[in-house]
Amino acid sequence: QLPIAPDAAKEYMPILIGLSIAGVIYGSIVALRQKDLKKLLAYSSLAHVGLIAAGCYTLTADGLNGAVYQMIAHGFVIVGLFFAAEVIFRRFETRKIDELGGIRSQASGFTSMFMILVLASVALPGTYNFVGEFTVLYSLSQVNIWFAVIGGTTIILGAYYMLKMFQNVMLGETNTKVFKD
């Protein structure tokens, strides 16, 4: 239980979880429409923070533990992704996803590192992010199964836009600028 205003926390729990999941949906939909690499990562981060908040508002031990796991894991992964995005920007002088591409053919080591970060961000089983997201979804299912179903659906949506971004940036048509490894 949360020690501050436990009665109010219990009363408003469904509303707060609903708002948190709405934040996840909003972040995911806006990230889907992004053409800028850093903006896509920022809205993806917003979606992850919404899931963290939903885990906190379940008022269960599993929800809080999952939220903490997710905070730590997301912190490490998003820093790596933003760092990689900055490296890409400094080499290509653009953040537009459509203008990037073919980095794999020029920098295979960088592509491998970026892929590991993307897979961690989408909570591939075996990553620390998976533990956090799975625990949060489990705690949401204890409160209301529909919260967990909607939360799980947004995770699939997140995997779609992150893997699509990876495909366009790393595997897409080769950019004319040289990316030195």
Question: What spans do the regions from the language model cover?
Answer:
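Residue-level micro-sites within transmembrane alpha helices that shape
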Residues: 35-38, 47, 69-73, 77, ...
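Transmembrane alpha-helical segments of integral membrane proteins
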Residues: 162-177
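Interfacial and helix-entry/exit segments of alpha-helical transmembrane bundles
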Residues: 42-49, 77-158, 177-181
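Alpha-helical transmembrane segments of polytopic integral membrane proteins
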Residues: 25-28, 82-85, 159-163
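Internal transmembrane alpha-helices of multipass membrane proteins
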Residues: 12-59
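Helix-loop interface residues and adjacent transmembrane-helix termini in multi-pass membrane transporters
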Residues: 9, 34, 61, 91-94
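Structural signature of hydrophobic alpha-helical transmembrane segments
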Residues: 7-22, 70-76
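Helix-coil boundary and interhelical linker segments in multi-pass alpha-helical membrane proteins
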Residues: 1-12, 52-69, 140-147
